[in-house]
Amino acid sequence: MPEESTITIKAMPACLLEEAQRIINGTRKTDYGPARENHELIAQFWSAVLGKPVTAEQVVLCMIGVKMARLCYSPEHRDSWVDIAGYVGVKSKMNRGE
């Protein structure tokens, strides 16, 4: 984490959330398949690399963590905020069995 980092979290505009929703309900599914299926596959790869079981839910949490770490260096980077919102949406889809 950068020294004396100050992160100001501003109100997230609705358009950012709408963008994340469009991505996970549109191109994301077309490009990567159903949310749960894709994240279970990622978990299998990570499990092999790490030598311990990883769940699809842990993949989502870790990806959010990656985006949060990047925001420590560039807190206004819009794409990271969209991605975080998208991963929250992906987790919601997984909960619904999508």
Positions of PLM-derived features:
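Intrinsically disordered, low-complexity regulatory regions
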Residues: 1-98
